Amino acid sequence: MIEVTVYQNTDGKKIGFSSVGHAGYDEYGHDIVCAGVSALVINCINSIENFCDVRFKVDADDEGGNIKFMLADPADGDSELLINSMILGLKGIQNDYGNDYIILNFKEV
């Protein structure tokens, strides 16, 4: 199962997210749930890097399917929009394939 956690500060502003695990929907190379989640997460990070003037840190473990993205400061309008867009896509995958394959959590830090 993939567990995505979106980190927020006490004001509800997004400050990062992590994605851990594999969906287990199908075998490697055929797992469309894993591919969809990966595409959304990586596209969000790449979009923030290319279109937003923010500092961030990324830690990734390709073998384990783990990635953690943390902003240096709470999300501004553009980076928050991109993170919210990723969340919308992840909720769509969760609705279509269920909680057996993806869990989306929000955590105040």
Regions found by a protein language model. Give the residues of each.
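N-terminal intrinsically disordered, cationic/polar leader segments
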Residues: 1-32, 41-42, 47-109
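A short mixed-secondary-structure module that forms the rim of ligand-binding clefts
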Residues: 35
